[in-house]
């Protein structure tokens, strides 16, 4: 079997970077939709933290786009899936846990593609983003567990809390949300 050309290897990496970017775009749309819904339900603290996670996902999407451009590719601008709308508070965090878990699995696969194609910079990018996605997963699982175990008592504690993230927000990871 002939060795892949440098251009073929680069295209393989661009392909997984674009797939990851599309996944991030979906997460942004999904989490912002949930932010608005939770804010409307008056669960400000939960709305705020989901918005901060969405901001992290925006940063991830931008990081993938920059790497794609460095490799000579064109970053995708479309999401991979449709947004789940009108979710109940209890559904949101189970859904988001599954979304993050799937993302982590896919990114680990993409990392291997980058490694197999000799792109250590993209490998490091995926490692960094996977670490942040694992923090998001931990947060979503924690809230999901609280909702499952405490139900309306937990939501009553959250009701009426502010949803504002302030003027400029660094995101969930950079701003150390859910402290």
Regions found by a protein language model. Give the residues of each.
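Iron-associated oxidoreductase/ferritin-like identity signal
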Residues: 1-179
